């Protein structure tokens, strides 16, 4: 599917120079005083991991990869692979761990994730926007600390470090964003 260079967004997967590239930063739209408007795009090759910056005229059209998305349930780790089960057809799928990269610690047993396929090959895994995790290490609660803008460091049950409000203690469950690993709220 062709899309305008102005329509490119972070996370889009493009077919460019016969390779698949993911847009890794928000594209910069520029209108210089002289010449035509252009879009500066930072992309990462999904096969090799190399990054590149390209400039496209705002009138250019690029090929956006048509991805098939399936809901899958995470079952277990097997070597360097994740074993997932298609929730519709109950087929088991092996996906390399590298696909998740830094988001791997958020993956919990039986979690439902979205797997995006290109030509029947798994490309990306989309985690839920938030997860509930328990605090395993943090400084003690300060008596009288209310909801303020001051935060303290905490380590969660999956090993991720986040900043949490002063009033939270070890063992409490919190909601964390999976995209930027930040605290949202105390779990209800």
Curated annotation (Swiss-Prot):
Keywords: Cytoplasm, Elongation factor, Protein biosynthesis. The keyword Transmembrane helix does not apply. InterPro entries: Elong-fact-P_C, NA-bd_OB-fold, Rib_uL2_dom2, Transl_elong_fac_P/YeiP, Transl_elong_KOW-like, Transl_elong_P/YeiP_cen, Transl_elong_P/YeiP_CS, Transl_elongation_fac_P. GO terms for cellular component: cytoplasm. GO terms for biological process: peptide biosynthetic process. The keyword Transmembrane does not apply. GO terms for molecular function: translation elongation factor activity. PROSITE patterns: EFP (PS01275). Pathway: Protein biosynthesis; polypeptide chain elongation. It is found in: Cytoplasm. Belongs to the elongation factor P family. NCBIfam families: efp (TIGR00038), PRK00529.1 (NF001810). Involved in peptide bond synthesis. Stimulates efficient translation and peptide-bond synthesis on native or reconstituted 70S ribosomes in vitro. Probably functions indirectly by altering the affinity of the ribosome for aminoacyl-tRNA, thus increasing their reactivity as acceptors for peptidyl transferase. This is Elongation factor P. It comes from Rickettsia prowazekii (strain Madrid E). The gene is efp.
């Amino acid at each position: 599917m062709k899309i305008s260079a102005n329509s490119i967004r972070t996370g889009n997967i493009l077919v460019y120079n016969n390779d698949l590239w993911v847009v890794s930063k928000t594209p910069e739209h520029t209108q210089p005083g002289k010449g035509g408007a252009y879009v500066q795009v930072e992309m990462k090759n999904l096969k090799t991991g190399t990054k590149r910056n390209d400039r496209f005229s705002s009138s250019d059209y690029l090929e956006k990869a048509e991805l098939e998305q399936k809901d899958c349930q995470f079952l277990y780790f097997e070597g360097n692979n994740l074993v997932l089960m298609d929730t519709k057809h109950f087929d088991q799928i092996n996906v390399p761990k590298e696909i998740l990269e830094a988001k791997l610690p958020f993956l919990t047993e039986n979690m439902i994730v979205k797997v995006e396929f290109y030509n029947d090959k798994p490309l990306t895994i989309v985690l839920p926007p938030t997860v509930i995790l328990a605090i395993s290490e943090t400084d003690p609660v300060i008596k009288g600390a209310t909801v303020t803008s001051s935060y303290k460091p905490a380590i969660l049950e999956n090993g991720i470090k986040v900043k949490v409000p002063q009033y939270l203690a070890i063992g409490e469950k919190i909601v964390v964003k999976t995209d930027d690993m930040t605290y949202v709220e105390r779990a209800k």
